[in-house]
Amino acid sequence: MTALAIRGGHLLDPAAGVDGPKDILFKDNRVAEIAAPGKLKLANGAETLDARGLVVAPGLVDIHVHLREPGQGYKETIATGTAAAAAGGFTSEIGRAHV
């Protein structure tokens, strides 16, 4: 079992009513626990990331995307455009027609 703790980040989750500093524990790529800063009990070997001063949020949705296919794949492909979005924290995109 792999464990990762993100410590002290400003967690923003409007659906859960959370807006403030938290520690988040992930086990096997799933959220296992959310606690006040410094309150997580970690097993030996757990990786930790210091997120103080950073925002931690669920995946973002880009509601206005123009992917360049078909017709302008030399500028950007669906694969490169969605990879760039994922690198920026976007887990969903709403594509617009590019005419």
PLM features per residue range, with description:
Residues A3, A46, T91:
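Conserved acidic residues
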Residues G9, A16, K22, F26-K27, ...:
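Non-transmembrane, interaction-prone segments in cytosolic or luminal domains
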Residues M1-A43:
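N-terminal metal-binding scaffold of metallo-dependent hydrolase/deaminase domains
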Residues K39-V56:
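Active-site metal-binding motif and surrounding structural segment of the metallo-beta-lactamase
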Residues R52-R96:
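Metal-associated gating/positioning segment near the N- to mid-region
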